[in-house]
């Protein structure tokens, strides 16, 4: 690795650390009293805007940023099978969760669907951009010991640890589910050589919970 590449990698790693710390503090940013009593929508917009700004900076700094960070179209023939598999697993998980914890299916009220679907889409894109694109891509580019498998595991665990609310409230089901989701989406990204299928898959998992257990989860964001 040349000096210029090493310098670019160091800067990209620094920005990535800030990006991950931003994810750790995302709930406080989006629910800040400063925004809540003025423009409630400004908190989420500020957070997602910062994520995109950091991501753009890292893409431009890292050599061949789009390629190394999986910001390319999916390999032909990979997206549909991967998404179908995620849809099936997401639906089965949501049904099992609904019956295990709530005794039956309780869908999200239709009046709440537009805002929740928009939030789910934004969350899926931001999380996958942060962890499956940037963190995973940088770990692989840096050549950490253990190779691709270690990179997938590390980013999945880091993604789980970033769920501060789940840790604080000891919601072990969702915490373990977050790590498993991060691990699965990591391999989806590697398989498709693109983060796009992981974004869609993440969105499918969240919307499955809305469809089968959203009526009881509506007071708590997923």
Q: What residue ranges belong to the model's regions?
A:
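Alpha-helical transmembrane segments of integral membrane proteins
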Residues: 6-14, 42-50, 80-84, 88, ...
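C-terminal ends of transmembrane helices
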Residues: 24-33, 93-106, 159-170, 208-215
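Transmembrane helix-loop-helix hairpins at the membrane interface
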Residues: 18-20, 113-222
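Juxtamembrane helix-loop-helix connectors linking adjacent transmembrane helices
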Residues: 32-42, 59-129, 136-146, 216-222
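Sequence-level detector for tyrosine residue identity
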Residues: 34-39, 47-48, 102, 159, ...
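N-terminal, membrane-interfacial amphipathic/helix-forming hydrophobic leader that caps
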Residues: 1-70, 150-153, 207-222
